[in-house]
């Protein structure tokens, strides 16, 4: 954290840090994780970008807890458009991210149908962005995993276009 302050002293940098709506896997508790985020913000971070999540309510509760803890930077939600559910489940298991039962049901039976999986994943991501937008969220971070085409299509469908 000390080196971040050095960087900001030298130039006009924006500093983004990681945040975990469903708690970092190595954190001792949700409160300890929140205090760690506060420490990073107090050290000069301009914004926090969250780990991906699939439960919008977990993000909204986390955002409320951040406000209550005096964290006054934008908490940008991390959105993971899912095209491969098995891979997403593996990522979720490693990162303490809960996959809602409804989501698992939506991908059930699609192991051999990549195109339908992409459509389902894009639809879920679009619904998340729409709900979060209604809750006042203005900026989003898409985890593309080097496959930007799904995120591009999602943004296009939501009205975000180059040059706008």
Where are these regions (language model features)?
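Catalytic-face loop-and-helix region of soluble metabolic enzyme cores
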Residues: 78-135
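C-terminal helical cap(s) of enzyme catalytic domains, especially alpha/beta-barrels
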Residues: 148-164
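Active-site beta-loop-alpha junctions enriched in small/polar residues
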Residues: 18-24, 53-54, 78-82, 110, ...
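Active-site glycine-rich loop that binds ribose-phosphate moieties when present
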Residues: 26-45
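Conserved, mostly hydrophobic/aromatic
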Residues: 40, 44, 77, 140
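A structural motif corresponding to the C-terminal end of an alpha-helix
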Residues: 8-13, 43, 128-139
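Short, small-residue-biased leader/transition segments that mark boundaries at the very start
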Residues: 1-7
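Active-site mouth loops of central-metabolism enzymes
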Residues: 14-32, 109-123
């Amino acid at each position: 954290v000390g080196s971040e302050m050095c960087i900001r002293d030298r130039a006009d940098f924006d500093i983004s840090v990681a945040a975990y709506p469903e708690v970092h896997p190595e954190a001792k508790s949700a409160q300890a994780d929140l205090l760690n985020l506060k420490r990073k913000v107090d050290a000069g971070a301009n914004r926090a970008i969250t780990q991906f999540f699939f439960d919008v309510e977990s993000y909204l509760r986390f955002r409320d807890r951040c406000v209550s803890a005096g964290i006054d930077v934008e908490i940008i939600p991390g959105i993971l458009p899912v095209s491969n559910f098995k891979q997403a489940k593996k990522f979720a298991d490693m990162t303490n991210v809960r996959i809602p039962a409804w989501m698992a049901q939506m991908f059930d039976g699609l192991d051999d149908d990549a195109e339908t999986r992409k459509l389902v994943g894009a639809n879920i991501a679009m619904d998340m962005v729409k709900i979060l937008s209604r809750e006042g969220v203005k900026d989003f971070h898409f985890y593309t995993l080097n496959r930007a085409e799904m995120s591009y299509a999602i943004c296009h469908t939501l009205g975000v276009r180059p040059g706008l």
